[in-house]
């Protein structure tokens, strides 16, 4: 019994060390813990993997070390988020490029990396996705598109980029919600004017 408890606490302590190392960009400790046998696919109670945590931080050395241990790159947490989505919303362009090179998916059901990037105005990340053929008018379960999110969050540059690549300005969610409505509800007047000029309807 004592040995089992000791092993449990030892594992928990090692996991905390790993989380701290990822947050601090301590690549040496990350590498050491992996070499000692920590499972690279270890997740927390919300299903967030070590790779997802590293993707949020954007430290390339740590990210590459974790990737060298062959984690599940396309894994999703309990909220349907991937490592690529987390790198996208933070605007970590190099991390995004590296994850794509390792097989991360640009498009999948539900929220997409493009939507995450658009909501935070991560224009360079968005451009990369669009150049690589991301589905620009893809909608999540409630019918929101990247354009609607950009309009709602007041992200003018993101909105203009999406329009440049041909986003449909008049798409409606199942409940009738449009990008123009999103802009008006949040008093994003400049975006509303841009959408109206482009022919958007409520």
Model-derived features: positions:
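Ankyrin repeat domain, specifically the short helix-to-loop turn at the C-terminus of the second helix
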Residues: 31-39, 64-72, 97-105, 127-135, ...
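Intrinsically disordered, low-complexity regulatory segments in ankyrin-centric signaling systems
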Residues: 8-36, 45-48, 64, 68, ...
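Ankyrin repeat boundary/linker residues
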Residues: 44, 77, 107-110, 140, ...
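Conserved ankyrin/ankyrin-like repeat signature
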Residues: 29, 61-62, 94-95, 124-125, ...
